[in-house]
From Swiss-Prot:
Reaction(s) this enzyme catalyzes, per UniProt: tRNA(Val) + L-valine + ATP = L-valyl-tRNA(Val) + AMP + diphosphate
Keyword entries, A-Z: Aminoacyl-tRNA synthetase, ATP-binding, Cytoplasm, Ligase, Nucleotide-binding, Protein biosynthesis
The family this protein is said to belong to: Belongs to the class-I aminoacyl-tRNA synthetase family. ValS type 2 subfamily.
GO annotation terms (biological process): valyl-tRNA aminoacylation
GO terms of molecular function: aminoacyl-tRNA deacylase activity; ATP binding; valine-tRNA ligase activity
Gene name tied to this protein: valS
Pfam families: Anticodon_1, DUF5915, tRNA-synt_1
Protein name: Valine--tRNA ligase
């Protein structure tokens, strides 16, 4: 092999910049045409384009890239697409901040243009970070949800689902964020425990307890448990609501908890989901006391225009003044918050668009999908089981996919766009036909679609749905975080079933969250945020990718620790030193030499290493098939450092530098095979380093090569056992030299090995000594040569006399003292008096004599090693 100069130190940034410039990214492209390879389509998460590709994104994309690179090497036609989920409130807020406007101060089209421009710039920033981290994205299959080429599919999916009866329009209670002024789905509600007050209020016949006195204007009934005898005489009677004066009926319902508060509750429209259930069940009237901005309406009387907080304070004051409020108690309450702004959500009844939830179909599809880890499926099952309301998909914003709907001004009928009209914005275009009533005057739908309506068709989009390509659903895998199982995973399954009647993917692999170095969730307020750019600048992309691989098992949260990155960087240098040493001995070795190398020319330690190497390939393949990145990379790193560097290279140096051409050729073959195989195994994890390694084996990219196959013929327990013995013997001899203060390359007179059938050449080379295999069992004579007093025993007993006892012991014949110790009692004379000692008072040092020579014997399992001095 030819060898260019290999520097001693590995310059990661220089290498990574070189390959970023050299790589032809078309090698990552998916082939839509006829291809003998099985397809492997990844339903990649489209991140929100904030301009910051944060460390949580980076961890997820590391996982995806490990999968994509591995599957390509396994012979799959891989698609690793990249999408961008553009629409959403944060962009609207940022545009308002940048331009010093509100969205209602400019035309809708102009505001959307501002949002698009900001988003496009943010995408470019994030794309640069992704390229720097070495992700093998198929950029020929990039998609941007704000582009007409994508949102036309979102609109088509809406039209088809509406026509098929999956979507409907209704005035129905929905979760509402007063701050964002939009409806939100239940999946977008997050819960937090907060302290509130439980207020005890006199009604004219019963006392009620409520946490929402500000909604008394919307009280439409009072409920008690039918088994609660305290109120049985009042059930069905009218009750007057204090301050507001409306009369409501006392109803009995088993959902009321008699133990809570007074056992009587106020039903308002709407304080919570239970109010909605009762409202529907009993056909109660609807009183809208709260508007979309979170202020009280005319229904609240003198409290009109107040915020909820202001109204609560005023109502409580008035109840106290009138003598209706007779007690208050602190209560810890689970409060639903908007996932975007943390504002407590309200429930308003507004005309909205909904998607019907197919509970049974979603659960069945979830069972057909393979989950990694398996226990994550329970999260989807639990969420599906708790879904009482359909998915509210309409939002009161501007920067989102328009709902392709108009309303006839004359008869009020819905006019839905035909597919041939799409993409379309009903606020800028009118229908291309008249209403069934004959009218041509329409009001456009001003609401837009929930952004999950865009991202929930990613599996359909990347599989070729509604394109010139053949449909390839289901895709093979969905990689995503556990925090969006109830949204992205849930909605994608729902939509794939509704539109195509198929599951969206064969498998789903779940990643955890990234925690800061302090173990807490990363946040600017805690000052524990680390960016991928910080790591790549200080260390390298490959070091960052190693952290991603070994940080934790699939599904678990991963803590970012700088020491893990430092360890990763050290491994790169260690692996580089291994590679550099190996290549220095392969200058006269050609790949053809490896193809024709006879296996019987291998020595024991060669077969030992190749057996372990093939076991490593087998382990790595099985673990990566199960998406176990941490155990895979740890196994590769452990083999390279501990098996190859610490043992094999030390054992074969004698052959590599020696005069035996056949032994040297065998070692060269093993070095070539092992380093080349390691470059392939490392390729999915540290692509820059692996490419640099492989570039001296071939002009082709390592990322276009085939994953190494297991050679079962080279796996041998017998070879490994013999190799372990060679390793252990060599290690014991090295420790022996170290204990005596000898240099490790200092020669010994001779090493004799009994009870072993192994090659001795590598032991001789590693110990710089003559080594001989001996037949039969060795005979040893153990001659006592010194009495060593045990001062831990003698000192406390004899104190000042201990020195005299030691002197007397050392004057005795070691053999005689040994004989006395064996009998259980030692008697010596100290200053003319007999002194008796226990056997533990002394240690007898013995010399080992074998064949008339003084030797040392080393304890090695399965063999006896004799060192001739």
């Amino acid at each position: 092999m030819t060898e260019s100069e290999i520097p001693k130190e590995y310059n990661a940034n220089e290498v990574e910049e070189k390959w970023m410039e050299k790589w032809n990214l078309s090698m990552y492209h998916f082939n839509w045409g006829e291809d003998p390879r099985p397809q492997y389509i990844i339903d990649t998460p489209p991140p929100y384009p904030t301009g910051n590709f944060h460390i949580g994104n980076a961890l997820n994309w590391c996982y995806i890239d490990y999968i994509a690179r591995y599957k390509r090497m396994r012979g799959y036609n891989v698609m690793f697409p990249q999408g961008w989920d553009c629409h959403g409130l944060p962009t609207e807020v940022k545009v308002e901040e940048i331009h010093g406007i509100t969205k209602n101060q400019v035309p809708r089209a102009e505001f959307r243009k501002m949002c698009r421009e900001l988003t496009a710039g943010n995408i470019e920033k994030m794309r640069k970070t992704m390229l720097r981290l070495g992700f093998s994205v198929d950029w020929s299959n990039e998609f941007v949800t704000m582009e007409p080429s994508y949102f036309v599919k979102t609109q088509k999916s809406f039209v088809r689902m509406y026509n098929d009866g999956h979507i409907y329009h209704e005035d129905h209670p929905v979760n509402w964020c007063p701050r964002c002024e939009t409806a939100i789905a239940f999946a977008e509600v997050e819960y937090e425990s907060r302290q509130t007050k439980l207020n005890f209020v006199h009604f004219d016949k019963v006392d009620i307890a409520t946490t929402r006195p500000e909604l008394m204007a919307a009280c439409v009934a009072v409920a008690v448990n039918p088994k609660d005898e305290r109120y049985s005489q009042h059930i069905g009677k009218e009750i007057t609501v204090p301050i507001f004066g409306q009369k409501v009926t006392l109803i009995a319902d088993e959902a009321v908890e008699p133990e809570f508060g007074t056992g009587a509750v106020m039903i308002c429209t709407f304080g919570d989901k239970q109010d909605v259930r009762w409202w529907v069940k009993y056909g109660l009237p609807l009183v809208k006391a709260l508007d979309k901005q979170g202020r009280m309406t005319k229904a609240a009387g003198k409290y009109e225009g107040m915020t909820l907080a202001e109204c609560r304070e005023a109502v409580i004051a008035d109840l106290k003044a009138a003598g209706f409020l007779y007690d208050q108690k602190s209560l810890e309450q689970n409060v639903g918050l908007c996932w975007r702004c943390d504002t407590p959500i309200e429930i308003l009844s507004e005309p909205q668009w909904f998607v019907k939830i197919n509970h049974e179909g979603i659960l069945k599809a979830a069972d057909e999908i393979k989950w990694y880890p398996e226990y994550m499926k329970v999260r989807l099952q639990n969420w599906t089981g708790t879904m009482e309301w359909d998915w509210c998909i309409s939002r009161q914003r501007i920067f989102a996919t328009p709902i392709p709907i108009w309303y006839c001004k004359k008869c009020g009928e819905v006019m839905i766009a035909e597919e041939s009209w799409l993409p379309i914005d009903p606020n800028e275009n009118t229908p291309k036909k008249a209403c069934a009533c004959g009218s041509t005057e329409f009001e456009p739908e001003t609401d837009v679609l929930d952004t999950w309506m865009d991202s929930s068709i990613t599996a359909l989009h990347v599989s070729g749905w509604e394109s010139e390509h053949e449909m390839r659903l289901p895709t093979q895998i969905r990689p995503q975080g556990h925090d969006i199982i109830r949204t992205w995973a849930f909605y994608t399954i729902l939509r794939s079933l509704a539109l195509e009647g198929k599951r969206p993917w064969d498998s789903i692999v779940i990643n955890g969250m990234v925690l800061g170095p302090d173990g807490h969730k990363m946040s600017k307020s805690l000052g524990n945020v680390i960016s991928p750019e910080e790591v790549t600048t200080q260390y390298s992309a490959d070091a960052f990718r190693q952290w991603g691989a070994v940080g934790g098992s699939t599904g678990s949260d991963v803590m970012f620790r700088w020491k893990d990155v430092v360890s990763a960087s050290r491994f790169l240098q260690k692996m580089w030193s291994i590679y550099r040493f190996s290549m220095s001995h392969l200058k006269d070795f050609e790949p053809a030499d490896a193809e024709n190398f006879p296996p019987d020319a291998l020595l024991t330690i060669d077969r030992w290493l190749l057996s372990k190497l093939n076991k490593l390939v087998d382990t790595a393949t099985k673990e990566l098939d199960g998406y176990q990145f941490d155990s895979t990379f740890k196994a590769i790193r452990g083999f390279a450092w501990e098996v190859l560097a610490d043992n094999y290279l030390e054992l074969v140096k004698g052959r590599l530098y020696g005069e035996d051409p056949e032994g040297r050729k065998a070692a060269q073959y093993v070095l070539y095979t092992t380093t080349r195989t390691l470059s392939l195994l490392l390729a999915p994890f540290i692509p820059f380093f692996a490419e640099e390694m492989y570039s001296r084996f071939s002009e082709e990219s390592v990322h276009t090569q085939t994953w190494p196959a297991v050679n079962e013929k080279l796996i041998s327990e017998e070879a490994e056992a013999a190799g372990e013995m060679i390793k252990e013997i060599t290690g014991e001899v090295r420790r022996y030299k170290s204990d005596l203060g000898m240099a490790l390359n200092a020669p010994l007179k001779k090493i004799e090995i009994y009870n072993a059938e192994i090659d001795t050449g590598d032991i001789a080379g590693a110990t710089n000594s003559e080594v001989e295999l001996m037949a039969g069992a060795p005979s040893f004579e153990y001659v006592p040569v010194e009495v060593k007093p045990n001062m831990g025993f003698l000192g406390p007993r004899f104190r000042k006399e201990a020195g005299a006892v030691v002197k007397a012991l050392q004057a005795e014949d070691p053999a005689a003292i040994e004989a006395q110790a064996a009998s259980g009692k030692i008697t010596i004379t100290v200053n003319g008096e007999a002194v008796k000692l226990e056997p533990e008072a002394v240690e007898i040092r013995k010399e080992v004599i074998s064949g008339g020579r003084e030797v040392d014997v080393l304890d090695v399992k399965g063999a006896v090693v004799v060192i001739v001095r």
